[in-house]
């Protein structure tokens, strides 16, 4: 006998009672309430045996039997009535089969008796002995027993449920373990259970399953059955013939025979169908609710938690008052099994919903009330889950969370919740979850993963949410402890990226998260790397351009210019040289750009010359043909007009000295060119650039034949070489006269020339420089001088360079600009022992620091100067001037900080020694002897300062007052020079620094307030030179005094003096600078370099005085204008970008005079001022003053055109500033419009020639200049012209075909679009509202043209042939490529103006919603259109505009498809559009979609537009978001079927609708068929069954049609399974 699982048979040694594990799960092997067909059978208890413990307990008896322990019967009766065994439901031979089926059983247990009706050991116990087996239910046991029977004959195949695989048995056994302890109710009578997998035959019988009842003919044992066996013989009538042909043939011969036969078969089928159809009406009624007391309600809930109580019994008394949050809490408290809890929720919900209908409300109101109730119920579920999750730490929290998650997920997937509300709440909760509860929400995320990522609306939000959480976790202080959480978040992000790539298209936040996303992927993996690259490209295409134009990629030439400018601060020639060679492939263009940079008037300083020379030397070593590049540069005559060619000749001179430039090659080229026959008509006519180099070449190191050839060419060019020799001889005599100790006497015939002329050629300058260097070197190499210099200071001073001689040599070489020779002279000067000369040498190195760093002499000179200082220190003649100079120079050398520290220690030691020395008694009588009239004043002061004794404060005050009086009288009858007095003041300061600073500040303030403040301009430079006052401190003091009080009598003169304090001397002025004056120039240069903003403030304040002065001060106005213009030019050329910004902020719009001075300065730099006579080229920090007219200038259109023509990579900031001045000038409005027209034409011209200078002209101008009102802006004009360009040009014959060549309109549209993209940063955040309707109309027109073209092609396909067919094919191909271009261009415009489509912007327009819907419809229909050439599926070339190609080349390239890009743009719009626009677009596309656009066949349609508001909320599995076609990195070739999914091969979604007529179009039988389409008056789609009425065991008595909807509506039949 096989015991049934409901009988509660326990395994060996198990307790008799059921143990509840708290899981709330139970396995009911029999449906509750199923009628028991065996209950009416007579039952007789089988005598059971009693053995020693453990005893066998008979649970197979009837319910009324008492379990008693009786001794086993010795012998069973043989003639037991068959009915007694029939109640057990097993044949008599079961015991035999059972005993033979346990080969694995141990021998310790008693063997089974084959003659007993029931085995001694239970079948469950036998199975428990088998390794790996567990408790199995009755069905599994029955299957095993059936399996152990002898196999049937080979000719018959066994039943499908027999010989089940072991894995199925194991799975059933494993599933039984959870519910094994929950036994069946004891009062349920036992009955035989039919196997669930047995085939059902007519009459509710089961094939090959006939339990032994004792009354079957097979069970009757007689002689026949004993001998022959039993078989079921079919009774055949004797009148039956072998064939029906004779009877049917006669009927078929008649004409109506077939109809009769057909009607007979049809009637038979109709009767069968009518018999099998469910015709009874629906008997479904939700179980009613009754009012119960609290005790009965609790008892009912306990019964509900007990899985043994059938639900049909509980459905009679469902108590009132259990709803909402209370229902869920009760289920959690009572541990109601999840399935039974869901059953209760459905019962309550069905009653609540049906209550709305019973109130007599209308249908629409009922639906609204039902939806409201579902939303409230969903909110209760949300609160319930939140409460369980937030109760972390309480008892059984893990079990409660598990139960709550299981229950809510079951309610979700049973369609008992509002999915939109629930998932939105889930994402909101996940976003707000702290780190301590985030793991729970991540576990729940796995449950709703596919539902969230089914639509982009939720998928994008989830992607940003996870990335934000990961970013916060990584940046958290407790990041190490959050490592598991970080890994889990990274895993989710990686899975989302690889499986749902489209959800990672984040137009708003890609730049924020792209680095974080790349860290989550394994970029070493090809798949991960390809997905990330394509994803980055997709995001870049849908992103709005950055606000700043500077973030865009710079052209190589501008990048090279930045590298050249960086040398001024980094001084790294090697790295810049290598980077420049990598930046530009054309080396000739690179050399050309370097020479332009060195000679442009828009850069400052002579250091560019030596930078260019060193770079050219390195490039020549690297293999660049520098000579040819330089010669070709000189041959361009148009370049010499805009450049300072003297710098170019200087570079060539340096190259000739180092033998880097081939003079012979240049002369050969000059002879081959034929310019040697050039003859000037006038001596004042300048030579051309290539010929002028012949005059500038240094000749000292040239071979004799090359020298002679040069002289010959000069003679033919009209230049006499003898003039060079005479000029050199005159200049040598003049220099020798000024330096007799170095060069000795000169010939008396030479004529002195002082000062030196400024137009000397580099041939003369180079010869004189080398002569001076040779003379200084020979002067310092005299052995007698060198020997005496080491022992005797007097001899050293007699034979070494004196300060005057050093100043003269330095002045000559600086006027030449020959700093390489000056570096050699400074090297020779370091051997002398004069502290003044050494300090001056250190100041010279500091003044030309950038040039010497490029030359490579700075470090060596500094080390030599430090050695000279150490030598002086050993000799006991320490100089404070030298220490100050060395410290200032060492601070600019990063590698000499230790040396600077030692120098500062020496300086502090000297200062402390002076301040701490005790004054001698004689110092009390010193003040009375100090008098400025004393002829021995300086001698006494030197003795006092050089003595070891200190100076008290009274003595300091006396000496300070005496020196100050000398300074104040320096303009008249002063006995001492100002520089000398200031030097003594600097020597006096170390004794009492604080008191001295206080006294000097008090004196300066007194001068500022007095009427004699004019002397301040005379004494301030030397005070700055000796270090007693700094320029920055003085400027700060002046501004503080001007703000504090107005007692300064001469504010106007003070502002002018302050301005002129910063202006360098003019070119003609003598440059003989002593130590103090040179240091002042050094301080001014450093101030202009470090504090340019304060310099602009000084210029602004000074220029403001021009408007307030009277006519009598006209000369002063001109002088002020000169100074301001020169200083502006210096500041503009030192740092153009920042200087232009400062000018826009501080000068423009302040004063008319400021604008005028700035205009003149710019005109001088740009060469626009006719009065200026050309450019003002800087040379050695000097400028040529040119008178300016301070009157206002009226802007002219020709000036704007010329400024635009002058725009290049160097003049760009100055042209920007000039155009800005033209815009801001007070003139008529039409002038502004004309200027805008000029700039727009320049933009079009530059775009056509692929230049980008116009972008810089517009990008850095002021806000008002960039955005003019309405269409006067350049970008708006480009947009206007872009939209005015016709989409398609009609053919001249007027037929429906399109013009074969519309390239002109396409090229024009490309130019306008390029301009719009370059200026896209100027689009406001709110977006221009006028663009939206225009874009919508353009896309509508594009769609209409596509529809008409499709109709035209389909209508003329059959009629066209021959030449007409070829012409039509060409026209169609041209149309499709134009369509692809315009579609991509309009998509780009949508991306640029995406902010105009946002919800705040759309709220201003009343028709915003229809425009948004039309825009989405157009994008979907065009992108998913199936064109013959599949141009929308081709990878866009370069700027993703289609290009002409051969048929063989029409293959998809790796990258983003234009179709995918279009859908990405649609996704970015959907992210901003309201849900109503999305719903209207979906409604239109599913009802009125054009036939050529198979939108509904594409799963991306549902992904982008879902969830649909009016879609049924039934159990329909919608397709999840599919990875992009390009996400895999490989794009398949376009197939003729027009499958637009591409990428991975995705199977077509199955049609969820049965019974679709075969005549339907293909567009209806598709993946979107669940959208309930209307066809011929019938609704085709899944029937929306109410999930609340899908109740099992709803009624106490099961009916024939116990369903919520009549099964007859679905052609359902009675099928017994």
Swiss-Prot record:
One GO term of the biological process aspect: regulation of transcription by RNA polymerase II
Region listing for Disordered, in residue ranges: 25-114, 1519-1552
Cellular-component GO terms for this entry: mediator complex
Ranges of Polar residues composition bias in the record: 40-51, 99-111
A Pfam short name: ARM_SRB8
Predominant subcellular localization, coarse grouping: nucleus
Subcellular location: Nucleus
GO molecular function: transcription coregulator activity
Segments of skewed composition (Basic and acidic residues): 66-80
Key words of the record: Activator, Nucleus, Repressor, Transcription, Transcription regulation
Segments of skewed composition (Low complexity): 1523-1543
Family designation: Belongs to the Mediator complex subunit 12 family.
Description of how the protein assembles with itself and partners: Component of the srb8-11 complex, which itself associates with the Mediator complex.
Function statement: Component of the srb8-11 complex. The srb8-11 complex is a regulatory module of the Mediator complex which is itself involved in regulation of basal and activated RNA polymerase II-dependent transcription. The srb8-11 complex may be involved in the transcriptional repression of a subset of genes regulated by Mediator. It may inhibit the association of the Mediator complex with RNA polymerase II to form the holoenzyme complex.
PANTHER family the UniProt entry points to: MEDIATOR OF RNA POLYMERASE II TRANSCRIPTION SUBUNIT 12 (PTHR46567:SF1)
Protein name in UniProt: Mediator of RNA polymerase II transcription subunit 12
Upper taxonomic lineage: Eukaryota, Fungi, Dikarya, Ascomycota, Pezizomycotina
């Amino acid at each position: 006998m096989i015991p049934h699982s409901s009988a509660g048979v326990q395994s060996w040694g198990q307790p008799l009672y059921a143990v509840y594990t708290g899981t709330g799960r139970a396995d009911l092997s029999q449906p509750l309430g199923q009628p028991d067909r065996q209950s009416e059978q007579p039952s007789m208890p089988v005598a059971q045996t009693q053995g020693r413990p453990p005893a066998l307990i008979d649970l197979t008896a009837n319910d009324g039997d008492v379990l008693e322990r009786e001794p086993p019967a010795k012998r069973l009766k043989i003639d037991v009535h068959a009915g007694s065994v029939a109640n057990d439901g097993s044949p008599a031979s079961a015991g035999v089969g059972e005993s033979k089926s346990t080969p694995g059983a141990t021998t310790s247990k008693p063997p089974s008796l084959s003659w007993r009706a029931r085995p001694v050991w239970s079948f469950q116990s036998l199975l428990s002995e088998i390794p790996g087996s567990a408790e199995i239910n009755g069905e599994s046991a029955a299957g095993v027993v059936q399996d152990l029977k002898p196999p049937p004959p080979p000719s018959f195949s066994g039943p499908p449920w027999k010989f089940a695989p072991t894995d199925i048995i194991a799975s059933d056994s494993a599933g039984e373990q959870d519910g094994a302890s929950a036994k069946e109710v004891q009062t349920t009578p036992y009955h035989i259970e039919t196997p669930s997998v047995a085939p059902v035959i007519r009459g509710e019988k089961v094939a090959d399953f006939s339990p032994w009842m004792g009354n079957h003919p097979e069970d009757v044992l007689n002689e026949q059955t004993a001998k022959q066996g039993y078989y079921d013989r079919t009774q055949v009538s004797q009148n039956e013939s072998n064939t029906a042909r004779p009877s049917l043939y006669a009927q078929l011969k008649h004409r109506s025979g077939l109809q009769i036969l057909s009607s007979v078969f049809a009637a038979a089928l109709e009767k069968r169908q009518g018999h099998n159809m469910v015709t009874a009406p629906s008997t479904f009624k939700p179980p009613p609710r009754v009012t119960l007391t609290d005790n009965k309600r609790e008892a009912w809930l306990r019964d509900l938690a007990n899985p043994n109580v059938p639900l049909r019994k509980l459905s009679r008394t469902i108590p009132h008052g259990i709803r909402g949050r209370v229902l869920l809490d009760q289920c959690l408290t009572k541990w109601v099994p999840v399935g039974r809890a869901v059953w209760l929720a459905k019962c309550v919900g069905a009653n609540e919903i049906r209550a709305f209908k019973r109130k007599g409300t209308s249908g629409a109101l009922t639906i609204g009330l039902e939806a409201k109730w579902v939303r409230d119920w969903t909110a209760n579920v949300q609160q319930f889950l939140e409460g369980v999750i937030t109760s972390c730490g309480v008892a059984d929290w893990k079990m409660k969370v598990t139960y709550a998650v299981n229950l809510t997920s079951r309610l979700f997937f049973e369609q008992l919740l509002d999915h939109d509300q629930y998932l939105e709440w889930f994402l909101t909760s996940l976003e707000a979850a702290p780190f301590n509860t985030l793991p729970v929400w991540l576990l729940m995320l796995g449950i709703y993963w596919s539902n969230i990522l089914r639509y982009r609306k939720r998928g994008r939000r989830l992607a940003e949410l996870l990335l934000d959480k990961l970013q916060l976790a990584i940046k958290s202080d407790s990041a190490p402890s959050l490592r598991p959480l970080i890994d889990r978040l990274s895993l989710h992000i990686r899975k989302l990226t690889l499986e749902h790539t489209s959800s990672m298209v984040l137009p708003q936040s890609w730049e924020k998260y792209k680095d974080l996303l790349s860290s989550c992927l394994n970029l070493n993996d090809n798949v991960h790397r390809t997905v990330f690259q394509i994803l980055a490209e997709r995001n870049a295409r849908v992103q709005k351009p950055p606000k700043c134009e500077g973030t865009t990629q710079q052209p190589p030439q501008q990048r090279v210019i930045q590298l050249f400018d960086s040398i001024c601060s980094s001084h790294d020639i090697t790295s810049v040289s290598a980077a420049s060679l990598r930046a530009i492939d054309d080396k000739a263009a690179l050399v050309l750009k370097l020479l332009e940079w060195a000679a442009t008037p828009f850069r400052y300083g002579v250091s560019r010359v030596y930078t260019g020379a060193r770079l050219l030397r390195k490039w020549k070593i690297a293999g660049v043909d520098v000579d040819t590049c330089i010669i070709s540069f000189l041959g361009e005559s148009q370049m010499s007009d805009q450049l300072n060619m003297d710098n170019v000749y200087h570079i060539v001179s340096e190259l000739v000295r180092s033998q880097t430039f081939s003079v012979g090659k240049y002369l050969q080229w000059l002879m081959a060119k034929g310019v040697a026959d050039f003859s000037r008509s006038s001596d004042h006519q300048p030579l051309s650039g290539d010929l002028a180099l012949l005059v500038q070449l240094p000749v000292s190191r040239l071979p004799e034949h090359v020298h002679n050839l040069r002289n010959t060419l000069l003679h033919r060019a009209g230049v006499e070489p003898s003039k060079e020799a005479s000029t050199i001889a005159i200049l040598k005599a003049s220099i020798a006269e000024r330096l007799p100790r170095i060069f000795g006497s000169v010939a008396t015939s030479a004529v002195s020339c002082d000062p030196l002329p400024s137009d000397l050629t580099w041939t003369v300058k180079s010869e004189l420089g080398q002569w001076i260097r040779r003379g200084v070197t020979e002067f310092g190499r005299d052995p007698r001088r060198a020997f005496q210099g080491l022992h005797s200071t007097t001899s050293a001073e007699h034979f070494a360079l004196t300060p005057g001689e050093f100043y003269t040599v330095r002045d000559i070489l600086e006027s030449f600009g020959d700093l390489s020779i000056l570096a050699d002279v400074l090297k020779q000067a370091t051997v002398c022992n004069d502290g003044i000369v050494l300090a001056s040498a250190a100041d010279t190195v500091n003044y030309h620091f950038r040039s010497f760093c490029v030359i490579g002499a700075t470090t060596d000179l500094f080390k030599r100067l430090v050695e000279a200082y150490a030598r002086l220190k050993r000799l006991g003649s320490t100089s404070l001037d030298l220490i100050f100079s060395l410290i200032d120079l060492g601070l600019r050398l990063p590698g000499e900080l230790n040396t600077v520290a030692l120098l500062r220690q020496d300086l502090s030691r000297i200062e402390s020694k002076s301040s701490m020395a005790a004054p001698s008694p004689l110092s009390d009588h010193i003040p009375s002897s100090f008098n400025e009239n004393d002829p021995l004043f300086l001698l006494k002061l030197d003795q006092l300062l050089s003595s070891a004794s200190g100076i008290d404060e009274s003595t300091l005050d006396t000496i300070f007052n005496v020196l100050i009086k000398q300074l104040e009288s320096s303009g008249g009858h002063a006995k001492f020079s100002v520089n000398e007095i200031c030097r003594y003041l600097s020597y006096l300061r170390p004794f009492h620094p604080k008191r001295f600073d206080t006294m000097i500040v008090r004196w300066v303030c007194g001068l500022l307030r007095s009427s004699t403040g004019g002397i301040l301009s005379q004494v301030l430079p030397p005070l700055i030179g000796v270090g007693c006052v700094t320029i920055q401190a003085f400027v700060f003091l002046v501004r503080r005094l001007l703000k504090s009080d107005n007692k300064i009598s001469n504010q106007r003169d003070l502002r002018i003096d302050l301005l002129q304090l910063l202006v360098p001397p003019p070119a003609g002025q003598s440059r003989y600078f002593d130590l103090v004056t040179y240091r002042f120039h050094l301080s001014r240069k450093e101030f202009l370099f470090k504090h340019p903003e304060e310099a602009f403030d000084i210029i602004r304040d000074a220029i403001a005085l021009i408007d307030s002065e009277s006519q009598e001060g006209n000369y002063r106005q001109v002088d002020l204008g000169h100074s301001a213009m020169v200083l502006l030019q210096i500041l503009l050329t030192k740092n153009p970008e920042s200087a232009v910004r400062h000018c826009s902020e501080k000068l423009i719009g302040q004063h008319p005079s400021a604008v005028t001075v700035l205009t003149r300065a710019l005109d001088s730099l740009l060469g626009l001022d006719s009065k200026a006579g050309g450019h003002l080229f800087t040379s050695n920090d000097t400028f040529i003053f040119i008178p300016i007219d301070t009157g206002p200038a009226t802007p002219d259109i020709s000036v704007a055109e010329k400024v635009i023509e002058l725009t290049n990579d160097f003049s760009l900031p100055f042209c920007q500033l000039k155009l800005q001045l033209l815009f801001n000038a007070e003139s008529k409005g039409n002038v502004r419009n004309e200027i805008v027209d000029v700039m727009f034409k320049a933009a079009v011209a530059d775009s056509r020639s692929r230049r980008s200078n116009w972008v810089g002209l517009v990008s850095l101008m002021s806000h008002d200049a960039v955005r003019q009102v309405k269409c006067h802006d350049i970008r708006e004009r480009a947009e206007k012209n872009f939209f005015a360009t016709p989409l398609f040009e009609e053919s001249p014959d007027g037929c429906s075909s399109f013009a074969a060549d519309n390239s002109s309109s396409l090229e024009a549209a490309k130019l306008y679009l390029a301009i719009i993209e370059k200026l896209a940063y100027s689009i406001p955040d709110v977006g221009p509202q006028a663009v939206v309707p225009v874009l919508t109309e353009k896309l509508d027109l594009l769609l209409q043209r596509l529809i008409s073209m499709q109709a035209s092609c389909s209508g003329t396909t059959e009629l066209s042939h021959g030449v007409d067919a070829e012409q039509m094919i060409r026209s169609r191909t041209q149309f499709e490529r134009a369509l692809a271009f315009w579609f991509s261009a309009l998509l780009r415009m949508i991306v640029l103006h995406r902010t105009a489509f946002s919800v705040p912007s759309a709220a201003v327009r009343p028709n915003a919603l229809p425009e948004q819907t039309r825009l989405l419809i157009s994008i979907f229909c065009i992108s998913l259109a199936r064109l013959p050439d599949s141009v929308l599926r081709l990878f866009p070339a370069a700027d993703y505009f289609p290009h002409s190609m051969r048929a063989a080349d029409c293959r998809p390239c790796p990258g983003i498809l234009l179709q995918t890009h279009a859908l990405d743009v649609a996704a970015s719009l959907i992210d901003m559009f309201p849900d109503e626009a999305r719903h209207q677009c979906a409604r239109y596309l599913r009802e009125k979609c054009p036939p050529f656009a198979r939108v509904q066949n594409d799963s991306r349609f549902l992904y982008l537009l879902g969830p649909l508001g009016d879609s049924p909320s039934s159990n329909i599995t919608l397709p999840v978001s599919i990875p992009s076609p390009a996400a895999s990195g490989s794009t398949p070739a376009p197939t003729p079927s027009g499958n637009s999914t591409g990428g991975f091969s995705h199977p077509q979604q199955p049609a969820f609708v049965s019974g679709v007529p075969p005549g339907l179009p293909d567009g209806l039988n598709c993946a979107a068929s669940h959208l309930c389409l209307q066809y011929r008056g019938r609704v085709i789609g899944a029937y929306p069954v109410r999930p609340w009425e899908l109740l099992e065991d709803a009624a106490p008595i099961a009916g024939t049609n116990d369903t919520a909807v009549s099964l007859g509506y679905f052609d359902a039949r009675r099928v017994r399974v």
